[in-house]
Amino acid sequence: MTVSYGAPGRVNLIGEHTDYNLGFALPIALPRRTVVTFTPEHTGAITARSDRADGSARIPLDTTPGQVTGWAAYAAGAIWALRGAGHPVPGGAMSITSDVEIGSGLSSSAALIGAVLGAVGAATGTRIDRLERARLAQRAENDYVGAPTGLLDHLAALFGAPKTALLIDFRDITVRPVAFDPDACDVVLLLMDSRARHRHAGGEYALRRASCERAAADLGVSSLRAVQDRGLAALGAIADPIDARRARHVLTENQRVLDFAAALADSDFTAAGQLLTASHESMREDFAITTERIDLIAESAVRAGALGARMTGGGFGGAVIALVPADRARDVADTVRRAAVTAGYDEPAVSRTYAAPGAAECC
């Protein structure tokens, strides 16, 4: 039996690098999706093909970390995690199509892993609840691919719903729906892809996580969430000033997430926009994960009339989001494109987007 299963990319409205610190985040699922079509066969491997790559990749069912590399490592990691948890995985043929841009900060990796998990589960009749699937997906990304990411991307892909943002508490692993329908208030969410690509596997992302872990250790706690209620004064006990800045971002970002959710409840998109901009400033000044190109896009959007703008995703490239009055959307988009090109960068791809359904079997 051939099955098809789709999983979306995501935009994190606010709450960056908070998930592995057991804080808060507020993502939405995107209309852009990765679809995996899987036909089980009596073989000892899965042959995977992607519309983003030439040729095919062979994934042995008994694969181990490091055996499969490149784009296919994410699919292999999903297979490895399923089998490690005792779930059945048959051999077969797997076809992957996607309109989630790789390296754009929209979590193409989580979309791929989620779609593979869903397709194999649907083909075998295996029922795995969404939280467990998110944990399997994180295990695939952390332990097979080697990217030290948290649960945010996977929870967003699995729990996403139309006109809904997801307030995630990573300490308790709870997901609370929050109405997100800016169009009803004549506001649009612009997605501005800088075309500067980034990678999570290794590098700066891992350094930021290690910095946060050192800060927590200096404070005598297991995670920075444990000092959230103490306020910024608690950070004086952190030995390294850079680690202290990283921790300050996490604590202030957690509060911005809660304030943003409250603003949505009041349909106050002016306040929500201001929080986006404050988040971007914190990522630039305290967490040091933006770039000159990303800063230019965010700042140009605000100057042109956006209510607020911020980078979304792990950093060092990717995309910027902005809340924009509907009647200013074209001017903001044109201004951002022109500013980037004038500065010598590729023209950003600017589009409207919205909260869409989460992962599901395709008809």
Curated annotation (Swiss-Prot):
The active site is at D153. Mg(2+) binds at S109, E141. It is an enzyme of class 2 (transferase). Its main location: cytoplasm. The record marks R10 as: Transition state stabilizer. ATP binds at S50, G103, S104, G105, L106, S107, S108, S109. It catalyses: alpha-D-galactose + ATP = alpha-D-galactose 1-phosphate + ADP + H(+). GO terms for molecular function: ATP binding; galactokinase activity; magnesium ion binding. It holds the Pfam family GHMP_kinases_N. SUPFAM superfamilies: GHMP Kinase, C-terminal domain (SSF55060), Ribosomal protein S5 domain 2-like (SSF54211). Catalyzes the transfer of the gamma-phosphate of ATP to D-galactose to form alpha-D-galactose-1-phosphate (Gal-1-P). NCBIfam families: gal_kin, PRK00555.1. This is Galactokinase.
